[in-house]
Amino acid sequence: MVSHFMDQSECRESTFISKDINLLEQKTEKALKLKKTLLLIGVSHALLDLSEFGIDLSEAIIMETGGMKGKRLEITRGDLHKLLCEGFNTSRIHSEYGMSELMSQAYSLGEGMFRTSNWMKVMIRDSYDPFSYVKSGKTGGINVIDLANIHSCSFIETKDLGRETDSGFEVLGRFDNSDV
């Protein structure tokens, strides 16, 4: 997905960076000089690794796409964002919520509240009864209906914990002992 958007942007400076801190610093400096917005997208564990180098990304948009993928201990999204904000010297972290089984994603602009497209619906199920749903404001497991999945299953049950509100939904973490 990121590769597609990089191609569409026609920005020659777009690139993938793994652990090349020097390249990240060069790209950051160049974006600032050109008055371009830098968008850094990465999985949680990789962003945490980068944040430990203390690069000032206060002018960048940082978007985590979730998941420690077994590389680090799972922590809450709130704790993750606090560490990333401190490490990158920024006030907020944007987020993407989705998985390879879905065609659509939900996005948060940095306050932890995710919003979906009109064809995607998130429902919060009871943690102890997978056939029951909880009221708005209560915590439970996240179920997703994605009508964009026209050639595959349009609904999935995740092992993520969440809470729905009037303005969207929050992802609070994973069920204990759930698979990565």
What positions do the PLM features span?
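Short, solvent-exposed amphipathic alpha-helices that sit
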Residues: 1
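Active-site glycine/GP-rich loop and adjacent strand/helix microenvironment
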Residues: 4-180
